[in-house]
Regions:
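Glycine-rich Rossmann-fold phosphate-binding loop(s) that bind the pyrophosphate
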Residues: 5-6, 135-138, 263
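N-terminal Rossmann-like dinucleotide/flavin-binding domain of flavoprotein oxidoreductases
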Residues: 11-88, 169-191, 316-318
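Glycine-rich dinucleotide-binding loop and its adjacent helix/turn
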Residues: 17, 96-154, 158, 186-187, ...
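Rossmann-like dinucleotide-binding cores of NAD(P)H-dependent redox enzymes
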Residues: 42-52, 123-124, 129-133, 139-202, ...
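A Rossmann-like FAD-binding core segment of flavoenzymes
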Residues: 62-65, 69-82, 89, 152-249, ...
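FAD-binding beta-loop-beta segment adjacent to the flavin cofactor pocket
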Residues: 102, 236, 243-257, 310, ...
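FAD-site-proximal beta/loop scaffold in flavoenzymes
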Residues: 112-128, 211-288
């Protein structure tokens, strides 16, 4: 089989997870903004080169750097940056994986005001903002707010709703708000942006509560599927209300030989969903088709604020609404010995259990290293492992993972022994603190 890969969008490496998480990491580590931007460019370039060579070095793959435009269900026209047609290719199997783009709101003055960026543009600025105003209070907004606050920028979030993180556990959401405010982040809720204007080198944000000035504005107002300018109107592929390619459980579009993977098909916008989409398409094309969107299990996610929030499954309020009889437990990060070594006591871990089956319904982990821990809980949920297995498992010490010994205890026992780890006062913790500091 000859595979032709038309390289146009590379969201993950160029403008998504890799550059943002590199900057977030370097901000936490105390790097200057200039140093972090330089390293971000190096990381992006290195991974781009690696991925390109990984594809281009294979005899049965051609990598073409063109804009792709459908002219029928089977025929794709390839154009260069000037719009000149370079060639036309025909295929009996096609995968659309063009990702997503920023959703730009219709706000007066948005086209003429200066220094207004979407997340892509903000990753490529060559100066550190002194005053950053973020329009929107979703996960992208929170990651950028936390990141720039760590670099010393004063950040203001403008959220039109009455709260942020309303879909998360509210105990944890309240802690996140407090920790962001402790960094100097201002969060203005019930605030609608009406217009933008310029005043010398400042951008003026006009809201229903007055005016705010800043040298930089981020539009964190969501993303939408990248289906524009693909020529899909020349095909029988159906598009949804948000511009997404409509697919079935095998990720086939309404034209059965055209598949869609990643953000372009709508739904959860995570890199690892796109990677699993590949497994589903591979299973349908070359296997028995048994892997589908209906059986890939619980989907974890992490919001890479500082410290990160990671979650999988249900929170308590959702579980109750679905009729479950639940057990709920929590452990504060300040009661986990590893927090002393990490020098970070911020955070709270919570778990929700099905009281009848003893299976884990969900977990929300707000604290350092949660982005790693959540994957173990995802595995337990998928494999229907009772919570007692995680409760009684032997974990290395001192680690954040050993918090599961307490997190999955019955609530009464958790209150009695939380934080009472043998060896905490005289051996492991002081030794590993010295190792960590050197």
């Amino acid at each position: 089989m000859l595979l032709t890969y038309v390289r146009k969008y590379r969201h993950l490496i160029n403008i998504g997870c890799i550059p943002t998480k590199t900057l977030i990491h370097d901000g936490i580590e105390g790097s200057s903004f200039k140093e972090a931007i330089t390293r971000k460019k190096e990381v992006v370039q290195a991974l781009n080169n690696k991925n390109y060579q990984g594809l281009n070095s294979k005899d049965n793959i051609d990598v073409l750097n063109y804009k792709a435009n459908f002219i029928s269900n089977e025929v794709i026209e390839l154009q260069d940056n000037n719009g000149t047609i370079q060639e036309t290719i025909t295929a009996d199997k096609i995968v659309i994986n063009t990702g997503s783009r920023a959703n730009i709101p219709d706000i007066k003055g948005i086209d003429t005001a200066q220094n207004i960026y979407d997340s892509t543009g903000l990753l490529n600025i060559d100066y550190q903002p002194q005053e950053l105003v973020i329009i929107g209070g979703g996960y992208i907004a929170l990651e950028f707010a936390s990141m720039f606050a760590n670099f010393g920028t004063h950040v203001t979030i403008l959220e039109r709703g009455d709260a942020i993180m309303t879909n998360e556990d509210q105990d944890i959401a309240n802690l996140i708000v407090k920790d962001l405010q402790d960094k100097g982040v201002t969060i203005n809720t019930n605030t609608s942006t009406i217009a933008f204007s310029n005043n010398k080198d400042q951008t003026i944000i006009h809201t229903n509560h007055g005016e705010i000035s800043a040298d930089t504005v981020l539009l964190a107002t969501g993303r939408k599927p990248n289906t524009n300018h693909l020529g899909l109107e020349n095909t029988d592929v159906k598009i949804g209300k948000q511009g997404e390619v409509i697919v079935n459980k095998h990720l086939q579009s309404t034209v059965k030989h055209i598949y869609a993977a990643g953000d372009v098909k709508g739904g959860l916008q995570f890199t690892y969903i796109s990677l699993d989409d590949y497994r589903i398409i591979k299973s349908h094309l070359f296997g028995d088709g048994s892997r589908t969107t209906e059986n890939r299990g619980a989907i974890p996610y992490t919001v890479f604020i500082d410290p990160p929030l990671s979650r999988v499954g249900l929170i308590a309020s959702e579980a109750k609404l679905q009729g479950y009889d639940i057990l709920e437990n929590k452990v504060f990060v300040s009661n986990i010995p590893r927090h002393k070594i990490n020098n970070d006591s911020r955070g709270l871990f919570k778990a929700v259990i099905n009281k009848d089956t003893k299976e884990i319904l969900g977990a929300s982990l707000y604290g350092k290293e949660s982005e790693e821990l959540i994957n173990l809980i995802k595995l337990a949920i998928d494999q229907h492992i009772p919570y007692t297995v995680l409760r009684d498992n032997i974990y290395t010490h001192p680690t954040m993972t050993e918090s599961f010994n307490d997190l999955f205890l019955e609530p009464l026992w958790s209150l009695i022994i939380s934080g009472s780890y043998a060896g905490e006062s005289f051996s492991c913790v002081p030794l590993y603190t010295l190792i960590s500091d050197h």
